């Protein structure tokens, strides 16, 4: 199984633990990594991989550039807390690129802030509550984020279905609208299957 973890940071793909297929070759992709093997070298390693044991590689490359240039086809692509940083004018192109690095039946595993849940939290908040400061930090971070890495697109289950299924490349077949990740249960997780 070949897995791509986009915007990986230090997060391990959840789907890696859920798969019964062993061994796997995992490529963690993030521009925050120090020097790493060039994408071409990683592609060569994948081509030579004998599938007898698992292998993990790290790559310092922009997600768009990597997907535009790679010749690899991935069984799984994990996108955890990255998609909301893709601006709306690039979302459909990003999804198109995902379709070019997957084949029929392959899965895209996505975790994004669930803006429907965040909106409800705002509507029901009590500024006099003892936990308001923590509540405010969570909401401000997830809705606005730091200017150096702003959130540039809004995600709800309806929006995810609309954008991923619009061009008939993917079908969302699994949802979790109240998903807990990294200690917070404000996320939307879905699996989009390549069709």
Label for each model-derived stretch:
Residues 88-97, 107-195:
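S-adenosyl-L-methionine-dependent methyltransferase catalytic module, highlighting the catalytic core
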Residues 2-117, 190-195:
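Conserved SAM-binding loop
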